[in-house]
Amino acid sequence: MAPTISKRIKTLSVSRPIIYGNTAKKMGSVKPPNAPAEHTHLWTIFVRGPQNEDISYFIKKVVFKLHDTYPNPVRSIEAPPFELTETGWGEFDINIKVYFVEEANEKVLNFYHRLRLHPYANPVPNSDNGNEQNTTDHNSKDAEVSSVYFDEIVFNEPNEEFFKILMSRPGNLLPSNKTDDCVYSKQLEQEEIDRIEIGIEKVDKEIDELKQKLENLVKQEAINGS
């Protein structure tokens, strides 16, 4: 029997932070049982609390839709931890559906994550001269690759019963500084802003250089045509 839904609380919004993404590591000669010979990586896809705290009080289950080449590609995880581990050789988009507890009476949250298996470089500010540097963020050839995103689920005008459930646990505020145990922080947020600003500056510089080349080309053509 479905629970009785209480009335919604107007003009109120409640947010709860999550992280989602995947980790991956290249396998050596020893592979898990039943892993196909062509598979090169062991990976885990997940939805978690930022500090690995319990999120099952408002999330009922998480469904991951893998590539169709996997046996039973639709995997439903109905208890924490909301994650699954597989092997593979290629990157692909994973559809993630988050189902909330029945009391929420909320629609399914539907989004995608691009499974990342290979290391990549991130431009980060150079503290000496402000120029960008390349870093692999520990994603070196033999290290574990991590592709993880921080987000907030916003519940607009939750019903009274679900509001009580949400308020039964404290909201998680971002700490000021990141640590080995707590990466997601205002410091990390600022670093991401800095990376975006570096990218914008680089693009603006390239645009200006191309404009100058175009102006010089037009002037040269005018001289040659006179």
From Swiss-Prot:
- Tell me which domain of life the UniProt entry assigns to the organism this sequence originates from: Eukaryota
Coiled-coil segments on the chain, per record? 187-224
An example GO CC term for this entry is: nucleus
Q: Which GO terms describe its biological process?
A: chromatin remodeling; DNA repair; DNA-templated transcription; regulation of DNA-templated transcription; regulation of transcription by RNA polymerase II; subtelomeric heterochromatin formation
GO MF term list: histone binding
Could you tell me where this protein is found in the cell?
Cytoplasm; Nucleus
InterPro entries for this protein: YEAST_sf, YEATS, YEATS_dom
Q: Name one Pfam family in it.
A: YEATS
What sequence ranges are listed for the domain YEATS? 8-169
Q: Which UniProt keywords apply?
A: Activator, Chromatin regulator, Coiled coil, Cytoplasm, DNA damage, DNA repair, Nucleus, Transcription, Transcription regulation
The record's disulfide annotation reads none
- Biological role stated in the UniProt entry: Component of the SWR1 complex which mediates the ATP-dependent exchange of histone H2A for the H2A variant HZT1 leading to transcriptional regulation of selected genes by chromatin remodeling. Component of the NuA4 histone acetyltransferase complex which is involved in transcriptional activation of selected genes principally by acetylation of nucleosomal histones H4 and H2A. The NuA4 complex is also involved in DNA repair. Yaf9 may also be required for viability in conditions in which the structural integrity of the spindle is compromised.
UniProt remark on domains: The coiled-coil domain is required for assembly into the NuA4 complex.
Please give the subunit comment from the record.
Component of the SWR1 chromatin-remodeling complex composed of at least ACT1, ARP4, RVB1, RVB2, ARP6, YAF9, VPS71, VPS72, SWC3, SWC4, SWC5, SWC7 and SWR1, and perhaps BDF1. Component of the NuA4 histone acetyltransferase complex composed of at least ACT1, ARP4, YAF9, VID21, SWC4, EAF3, EAF5, EAF6, EAF7, EPL1, ESA1, TRA1 and YNG2. Interacts with SWC4.
PANTHER family the UniProt entry points to? PROTEIN AF-9 HOMOLOG (PTHR47573:SF1)
Misc remark for this entry? Present with 259 molecules/cell in log phase SD medium.
The name this protein goes by in its record: Protein AF-9 homolog
